[in-house]
């Protein structure tokens, strides 16, 4: 059964990163795994400081990945920002029937878009924004409907 669990400063402890790291599978490339660990620890610290919320995606108790979200402003436009999107290495690029025949990463981005749309109805919000790690990911996000800000590496999804 698919489940999204929300973690914020109210329900997370200083050992939050230990739980997240024990629930996921990092890259088999040691340099990439080290980079992922650094990002995950940083995101977990942001959760404890109330600046980020993390949603883990689980299937039958197995963590498929997570998305970290925060509120920001890009070029003076209020935005929901994807701070980090992580997919456990064994699920990267894998289409899952349990996720309505989509990849974990796409499922999490679509979830973030829905949250942004819900927020837009309650407060002024214009975009969902993210900073892709590389050009390959830029194409993935363009296919979903994201566009690049002019003169910046950031991408946005207009709500």
Language model regions located:
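Non-catalytic substrate-recognition and accessory regions of acyl/acetyltransferase enzymes
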Residues: 1-102, 106-159
């Amino acid at each position: 059964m698919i489940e999204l669990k929300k973690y914020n400063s109210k329900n997370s402890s200083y050992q939050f990163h230990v739980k997240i790291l024990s629930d996921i599978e990092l890259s088999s490339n040691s340099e990439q795994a080290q980079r992922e660990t650094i990002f995950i620890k940083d995101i977990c610290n942001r959760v404890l400081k109330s600046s980020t919320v993390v949603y883990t995606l689980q299937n039958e108790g197995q963590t498929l990945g997570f998305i970290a979200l925060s509120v920001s402003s890009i070029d003076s436009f209020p935005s929901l920002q994807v701070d980090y999107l992580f997919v456990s290495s064994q699920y990267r690029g894998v289409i899952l029937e349990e996720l309505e025949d989509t990849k974990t990463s796409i499922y999490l981005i679509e979830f973030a878009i829905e949250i942004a749309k819900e927020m837009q109805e309650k407060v002024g919000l214009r975009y969902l924004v993210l900073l892709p790690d590389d050009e390959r990911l830029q194409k993935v996000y363009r296919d979903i409907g994201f566009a690049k800000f002019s003169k910046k590496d950031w991408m946005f999804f207009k709500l």
